[in-house]
Amino acid sequence: MSLATLDATQHPNLPASAATLFKAKAHKKLSFEQIAQHIGRNEVATAALFYGQAKASPEDIQKLSELLNISPQVLEEQLSGFPDRGRSVEMPPKEPLIYRLYEIVQNYGYAYKAVLNEKFGDGIMSAISFSTKVEKETDADGNNWAVITLRGKW
């Protein structure tokens, strides 16, 4: 199994907590799925904590401290503030996978908007009252497909 790691030189705008968490994750050889199971979040929400894009609860801090052997005081200091969302990614993104997600919104954004407006009326989908997940599907020919679900309150 390959594990996501952090190359801080490619992410100069991440908070200090990112380096702390990724170093412990690598040392323990844990996947985001394993960490998510321990803290009771899904794996994308857990990864968002590591990148400083989500707010950690006191329970998250306690459970991460236990699992990763990081002082709760260090995690409290690094994770208890409000996230500075969105500053970690340059626009347009240069990383190919992140660029493809950006490209999906460029190509399908207005189509999503039109269909959502027809189904729900005027409004927006929340990114606060929101959840997302990633699943892997394999078709009959053995091809792997990524399935990304976005669920936001209207």
From Swiss-Prot:
GO terms for molecular function: cyanate hydratase activity; DNA binding. InterPro entries: Cro/C1-type_HTH (IPR001387), Cyanase (IPR008076), Cyanate_lyase_C (IPR003712), Cyanate_lyase_C_sf (IPR036581), Lambda_DNA-bd_dom_sf (IPR010982). It catalyses: cyanate + hydrogencarbonate + 3 H(+) = NH4(+) + 2 CO2. SMART domains: Cyanate_lyase (SM01116). The active site is at 100, 103, 126. The keyword Lyase applies. GO terms for biological process: cyanate metabolic process. Its EC number is 4.2.1.104. The keyword Lyase applies. Keywords: Lyase. NCBIfam families: cynS (TIGR00673). Belongs to the cyanase family. Catalyzes the reaction of cyanate with bicarbonate to produce ammonia and carbon dioxide. This is Cyanate hydratase. It comes from Aspergillus fumigatus (strain ATCC MYA-4609 / CBS 101355 / FGSC A1100 / Af293).
